[in-house]
A protein has these predicted regions:
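Alpha/beta-hydrolase active-site loop
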Residues: 91-112
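Short glycine-enriched nucleophile-adjacent loop
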Residues: 127-138, 144
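Serine-hydrolase catalytic core
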Residues: 7, 11-13, 22, 61-63, ...
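Alpha/beta-hydrolase fold nucleophile elbow
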Residues: 112-124
């Protein structure tokens, strides 16, 4: 693992306990990392979503113990059909999120551990699943970390990403051997056909492509809640091309007081996939830092900085 645990984090590791959640599609295996009793309580439970529950290089394990040492409780779990959970597995589609799984975990934590307020974090499919929880649990969710997720149907994402290409891009692509090898895959042929079609028609306008109905419904539930949210993308992410349509439409229509709850960050390069170690660590650090700022002590310190008064102890 790419980190060394502090004594406080090791204590949180030893305090972890597994539990099982009954969900409609299977019994979900989960791990609770309880907040350090000596830390100022955040009164928030952070639920991290991915497959498997540890994420790449066990970064959600690292995050769970670091946050718990600061007074957050945390939960990581396996979706149905994944890892140690029961149920049937299937190809994942961000527009068909596993809402029942995450809602079951939230309600189990409330009933069994007395947790009342939650923060959800995930990337791509997991971000869309986290967002979907607002439809049934918006009143109990205080924060959302939404990393590099598509907000259109997957076939539409391909089209909107194709609209960022031109003939010069296609010409350069012809001279890359990896592109020719990739054409052995049927899905790559379909993608290339879409790119050529969109470029040849010179549509160049993603505005003619719709956002996913599921995203719009879940986004409206987020708006109705009082939660804060961080939306983070890479400029070169295919998913960002679809999110730009959301920026121009559903985000632009928000009242100022609602829009102020949502932060949008677009970084150079890519964020999606966590495939490159340096960017993975940068994204992880940003997500944890954003969550840490939700701690009441952090908010009190920021308020004191603005007023010039000492923060309450």
């Amino acid at each position: 693992m790419p980190w060394s645990e502090t004594p406080a984090e090791l204590a949180r590791a030893r305090a972890e306990r597994p539990f099982v959640v009954a969900a409609p599609s299977g019994r979900l295996f989960a791990v609770l990392t309880p907040a350090a009793p000596e830390a100022p309580p955040a009164d928030l439970c952070v639920v991290t979503l991915t497959r498997p529950r540890s994420h790449r290089n066990r970064m959600w394990v690292e995050g769970a113990r670091r946050l718990a040492a600061q007074g957050f409780s945390t939960i990581r779990f396996d979706y149905h059909g994944c890892g140690d959970s029961s149920g049937d597995s299937a190809p994942l589609d961000p527009n068909r999120p596993y809402r029942d799984d995450v809602v079951a975990v939230i309600r189990h934590a409330r009933q069994q551990f007395g947790v009342q307020r939650f923060v959800l974090a995930g990337s791509c499919f997991d971000a869309r699943t986290a967002l979907s929880a607002f439809a049934g649990e918006g009143a109990s969710i205080a924060g959302l970390v939404f990393l590099a997720a598509p907000v259109m149907e997957l076939d539409t994402v391909v089209q909107v990403h194709a609209d960022t290409k031109d003939w010069a891009h296609l010409w350069r692509a012809l001279f890359k051997p990896d592109n020719w090898r990739a054409l052995a895959q049927p899905k790559r042929w379909k993608y290339m056909a879409t790119v050529v079609d969109r470029v040849s028609r010179q549509s160049g306008n993603a505005g003619d492509l719709p956002l996913s109905r599921g995203f719009i419904e879940d986004f409206r539930a987020l708006v109705r809640s009082r939660a804060r949210a961080l939306f983070l993308y890479g400029l070169e992410d295919a998913e960002y091309a679809s999110f730009r349509v959301a920026e121009r439409t559903v985000f632009a229509e928000l009242p100022a007081e609602v829009r102020a709850r949502f932060e949008i960050e677009v970084w150079p390069g890519t964020v999606h996939g966590f495939l490159e170690m340096t960017r993975q660590r940068e994204t992880f650090a940003r997500a944890l830092g954003w969550i840490e700022a939700l701690h009441p002590n952090a908010r009190a310190a920021r308020s004191a900085d603005r007023t010039g008064l000492p923060a309450a102890s």
